[in-house]
From Swiss-Prot:
Belongs to the UPF0337 (CsbD) family. It holds the Pfam family CsbD. It comes from the Bacteria. This is UPF0337 protein CE0198. Residues 1-77 are annotated as: Disordered. Residues 30-56, 64-77 have a biased composition (Basic and acidic residues). InterPro entries: CsbD, YjbJ_sf.
Length: 77
């Protein structure tokens, strides 16, 4: 859901920027650019979190592969 929300925020920012530039409202254009930047940052943080989870799951999986009789915590969600 976060990915969709981030994309929507980025698109909304692009629209604001375009309207601001078309009407000569530099403040609105700046606000649109800021919205796009914020959406890009949120997306990057979300992607980084996903990569960390994937890495943790691989590490946990490698321990299970070595000794399946040892109990391990659930995979990171």
């Amino acid at each position: 859901m976060g990915d969709l929300s981030n994309k929507a925020e980025g698109v909304g920012g692009k629209i604001k920027e375009g309207i601001g530039e078309a009407t000569g409202n530099e403040s609105l254009a700046d606000e649109g650019r800021a919205d796009q930047t914020k959406a890009d940052i949120k997306e990057a943080v979300s992607d980084a979190g996903d990569k960390i989870k994937d890495g943790a799951n691989k590490v946990l999986g490698s321990f299970q592969d070595k000794d399946p009789d040892v109990e391990h915590p659930e995979a990171v969600n």
